Amino acid sequence: MGMYTDFALKFSVSKGDLEVLEILRYMTDSRVPLKRKTPDHPLFSSSRWDIMARSGRSFIDEVDYLDTVDVMLIGEFKNYGGEIRLFLDWIKPHLAWDLIGYSHYEGDLETVPYFIEGPL
């Protein structure tokens, strides 16, 4: 059956980054269509990129009075293709603030922390 990886990532992106927001909405909600072609990045060639954030409590918080959108991706999936690392590599240039989070493979004793410093 395979082993699962739990993960949680919290970050913000600019409201003006429409392509990234559309992809994130698609990743978190299967009812949202993806109308654009995906970027040329290895993440989008992996087999599970589109479902990695649908198996948990992911959400996108779009508050009207802010210039940024807060995103929380929480999930559990089979990270066989290294999708979490690929996602971090893809999202890094789009961060408005720092990214914090972790992942934990169910067969390991240790949790892997993530911290990517934002542009400020």
Language-model features and meaning:
Residues 38-120:
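Charged interaction segments
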